[in-house]
């Protein structure tokens, strides 16, 4: 229940997939192993995005508890593994910016289906101001690189609202964000 401070009301990450043959979505299943509050806070699980890997595995990432989480399904979304924290998100996903009500640093995932590399970008206040970060996995999400500062600003500016895509022919990674 959105906005509820009742401990019985919890946020979860759910998954459903579209079937072309039946022209319908599957019944949604909960894929997050933990739950968050419903206050639209850093303790709320939200901002889920997904990507399909080289071998058909499905990856889902989301934010919550000042962390970036991932889960993976290797059977088309029927079953999911154990949630894994792949990065800490100091300050959480909801960042206060000058002249903006709130800036989000939600994670986005994309898969290079040729090289079998998964990339995740997000924004946080790791350096004291909002920056955009990238990590990647070359082993189907089992281990992740160190965080890379994409925005590389030299002033006290803020970068946020990131998103990414991959050129599946060249393998180039493109990240767009507000600055």
Which role fits each region the language model picked out?
Residues 1-179:
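Extracellular, repeat-based ectodomains that mediate carbohydrate processing or recognition
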């Amino acid at each position: 229940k959105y906005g509820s401070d009742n401990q019985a009301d919890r946020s979860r990450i759910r998954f459903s997939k579209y079937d072309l043959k039946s022209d319908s979505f599957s019944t949604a299943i909960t894929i997050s192993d933990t739950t968050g509050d419903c206050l639209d806070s850093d303790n709320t699980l939200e901002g889920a995005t997904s990507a399909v890997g080289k071998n058909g595995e499905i990856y889902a990432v989301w934010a919550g508890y000042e962390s970036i989480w991932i889960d993976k399904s290797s059977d088309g979304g029927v079953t999911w593994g154990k949630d894994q924290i792949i990065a800490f998100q100091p300050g959480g996903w909801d960042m206060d910016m000058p002249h903006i009500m709130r800036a989000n640093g939600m994670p986005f995932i994309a898969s290079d289906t040729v090289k079998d590399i998964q990339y995740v970008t997000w924004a946080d206040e790791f350096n004291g101001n909002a920056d955009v970060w990238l990590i990647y996995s070359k082993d189907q999400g089992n281990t992740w690189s160190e965080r890379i500062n994409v925005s590389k600003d030299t002033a006290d500016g803020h970068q946020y609202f990131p998103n990414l895509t991959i050129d599946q022919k060249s393998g180039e990674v493109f990240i767009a964000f507000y600055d």
